[in-house]
C-alpha cells in the first residue's frame, strides 16, 4: 500500500544530452528504514537522488510523499518536505564557523535581528542528542574531514529533516569514523527517520541497511532485503556477472631495492608549513608497498615530489640506483617510472584528444612513432589498437574515440594500459580504483598484482582500507606528512590502521 512508504519515486526518467541517466526507475522508502542505493560508476545513483533533492527535474515519472504526489522544483522545496542531503563533496563555507554553516539560509531572527544564541542552543541540543559533538565556534577550514561531515549532518537535523540522503558518506572517513557514522544512522532509524544511503561498499550495506535497490546503466535491477541476500548476489546484480571480491595473490618475493626515498621534506606555500616531513622508506622489486592515510595528510604532495610535478625542499630520491631527485618528468619516465595519477582528468589524460593520442603521450617522441620529425599515425593507431584489445578498453569508436566521451572505468583502463605496457621498474598507482565499480576494481587489482609478480616495484597510494589490506605486502601510514607506522597486512587490523591514520598512535606510541 502507498501509505506504507514515506517516499515513492515512480518511473523516474532523467536524460542528459546523449545519455539516459535514469530510465524508468522506481524507488520506495519506508519510514524508519536504512535503504541503500547500489550501482557501479555512472549507474545513475547520484542523479536519482539529485532528482529527489530538487537539483534536477525528471523528464518523466512522479514523486510521492506519504502517498500524495509532490513537486520538488529545488532544494528549498525538498527541505520544506523534510528531505535533507549530505553530498559526497561537502557544501560548506570554509571561512565561516561551524554554527554559521549549520544555520546558513535558515537563520532565526526577531524583528530583523539574528538570534544566534537561540540557534546555538538548538545546535548544541542536537549535537548532544545524536552524539555529533562539534565546536560551534571553530572555522570549517580548521576542522577534520570527519568533523565537517558531522556539520553537514547537523545542517539536516537543524532543518528538522526526516528523510536523510547520504551520498557516498564514508569515502573520506577513518574506520573508527565509519563505525561512528553507522551508529548514528542506527540512532536515526530508531527515531523513525528514513535514510537513503548511496554507496558502492558492500560491507557497509550488509552492516547497516535494511533493504537495497540496485541500479545498472541507468536501469532498475531490483530491490532486495539485506537479511535475504549476500555480497556476491549484490555484486552480481550490480555488474551482471560473478565478481571476485577477494584478490588472489601469492606471497611476495622481494628483490633488490628499486625506489629509495631518504629524508624527503616538502613545503606548502599555501599552508605555510611542511606538507611532507622527513619521509624515508624503500620499495623492492616484486612487492607492493601501500601508503595509507586519510585524504589531506601529505600523500598527494609526496607523490608530486616523487614524480617530478613539484620540487623537494630536502631529501633524496633514487630509482634503481640512479639519483632522480632533480630529474625532469620525462627523464623519470625514461628511467622506468610509471604513474597512474590520483586525478585522471588533470594529470592522466588530455580529455579532448583521441584515445590513440592519449596512449602515446609517454612515447610519441620515440623512433618507432616518428619518421623525418613527423609522427607516424599508422604506428600510433597500430599501438593503440593493440592496447585496447589487450586491456579491454571499451569505447564507441575505438582508437579514434575522444577520451572525454568514455566512462570513468574505461578512462582508467586506458591509463593503466599505457603505464603498464611501458614495462616499468617502478609503478606508482594513486587511488587507482577511486569512483569505479566492482567489475573495474577487480580488473585493476589483477593488473597491479600481475605487475608485482613480473618483478615490478609497486607503490600504491590508497584511501580504501579494504584495497590496502587486499593488495599490500607492506603498509606505511602517513599522518600530517609523516610516516607514523609500518605494518604487515597479515598481522594488523583495519582498526589498528585507523588509529594511526587518525593520529592517535605514532610508531607504536599513544599520542594525545
What residue spans do the PLM features occupy?
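Glycine-rich phosphate-binding loops of nucleotide-dependent enzymes
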Residues: 2-512
Amino acid at each position: 500500500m502507498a501509505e506504507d512508504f514515506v517516499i515513492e519515486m515512480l518511473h523516474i526518467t532523467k536524460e542528459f544530452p546523449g545519455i539516459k541517466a535514469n530510465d524508468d526507475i522506481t524507488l520506495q522508502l519506508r519510514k524508519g528504514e536504512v535503504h541503500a542505493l547500489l550501482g557501479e560508476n555512472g549507474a545513475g545513483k547520484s542523479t536519482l537522488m539529485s532528482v529527489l533533492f530538487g537539483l534536477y527535474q525528471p523528464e518523466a515519472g512522479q514523486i510521492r510523499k506519504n502517498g500524495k504526489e509532490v513537486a520538488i522544483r529545488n532544494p528549498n522545496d525538498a527541505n520544506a518536505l523534510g528531505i535533507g542531503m549530505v553530498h559526497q563533496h561537502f557544501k560548506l563555507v570554509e571561512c565561516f564557523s561551524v554554527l554559521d554553516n549549520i544555520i546558513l539560509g535558515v537563520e532565526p531572527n526577531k524583528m530583523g535581528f539574528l538570534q544566534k544564541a537561540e540557534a546555538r542552543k538548538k545546535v548544541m541540543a542536537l549535537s548532544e542528542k545524536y552524539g555529533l559533538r562539534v565546536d560551534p565556534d571553530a572555522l570549517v577550514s580548521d576542522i577534520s574531514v570527519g568533523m565537517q561531515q558531522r556539520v553537514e549532518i547537523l545542517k539536516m537535523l537543524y532543518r528538522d529533516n526526516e528523510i536523510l540522503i547520504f551520498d557516498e558518506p564514508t569515502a573520506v572517513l577513518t574506520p573508527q569514523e565509519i563505525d561512528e557514522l553507522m551508529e548514528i544512522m542506527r540512532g536515526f532509524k530508531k527515531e523513525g527517520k528514513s535514510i537513503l544511503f548511496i554507496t558502492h561498499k558492500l560491507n557497509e550495506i550488509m552492516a547497516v541497511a535494511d533493504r537495497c535497490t540496485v541500479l545498472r546503466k541507468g536501469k532498475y535491477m531490483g530491490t532486495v532485503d539485506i537479511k535475504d541476500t549476500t555480497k556476491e548476489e549484490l555484486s552480481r546484480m550490480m555488474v551482471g556477472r560473478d565478481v571476485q571480491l577477494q584478490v588472489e595473490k601469492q606471497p611476495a618475493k622481494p628483490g633488490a631495492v628499486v625506489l629509495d626515498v631518504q629524508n624527503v621534506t616538502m613545503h606548502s606555500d599555501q599552508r605555510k608549513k611542511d606538507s611532507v616531513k622527513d619521509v624515508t622508506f624503500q620499495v623492492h622489486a616484486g612487492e607492493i608497498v601501500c601508503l595509507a592515510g586519510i585524504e589531506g595528510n601529505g600523500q598527494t604532495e609526496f607523490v608530486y615530489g616523487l614524480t617530478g610535478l613539484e620540487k623537494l625542499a630536502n631529501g633524496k630520491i633514487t630509482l634503481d640506483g640512479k639519483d632522480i631527485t632533480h630529474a625532469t618528468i620525462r627523464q623519470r619516465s625514461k628511467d622506468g617510472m610509471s604513474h597512474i595519477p590520483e586525478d585522471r582528468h588533470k594529470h592522466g589524460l588530455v580529455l579532448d584528444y583521441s584515445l590513440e593520442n592519449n596512449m602515446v603521450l609517454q612515447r610519441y617522441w620515440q623512433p618507432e612513432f616518428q619518421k623525418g620529425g613527423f609522427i607516424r599515425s599508422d604506428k600510433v593507431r597500430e599501438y593503440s589498437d593493440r592496447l585496447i584489445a589487450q586491456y579491454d578498453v571499451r569505447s564507441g569508436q575505438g582508437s579514434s574515440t575522444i577520451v572525454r566521451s568514455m566512462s570513468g572505468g574505461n578512462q582508467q583502463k586506458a591509463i593503466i594500459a599505457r603505464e603498464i605496457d611501458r614495462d616499468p621498474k617502478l609503478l606508482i598507482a594513486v587511488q587507482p580504483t577511486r569512483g569505479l565499480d566492482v567489475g573495474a576494481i577487480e580488473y585493476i587489482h589483477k593488473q597491479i598484482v600481475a605487475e608485482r609478480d613480473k618483478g615490478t616495484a609497486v607503490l600504491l597510494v590508497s584511501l580504501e582500507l579494504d584495497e590496502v589490506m587486499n593488495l599490500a605486502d607492506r603498509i606505511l601510514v602517513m599522518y600530517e606528512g609523516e610516516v607514523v607506522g609500518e605494518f604487515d597486512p597479515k598481522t594488523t587490523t583495519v582498526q589498528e590502521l585507523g588509529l594511526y591514520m587518525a593520529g592517535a598512535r605514532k610508531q607504536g606510541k599513544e599520542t594525545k
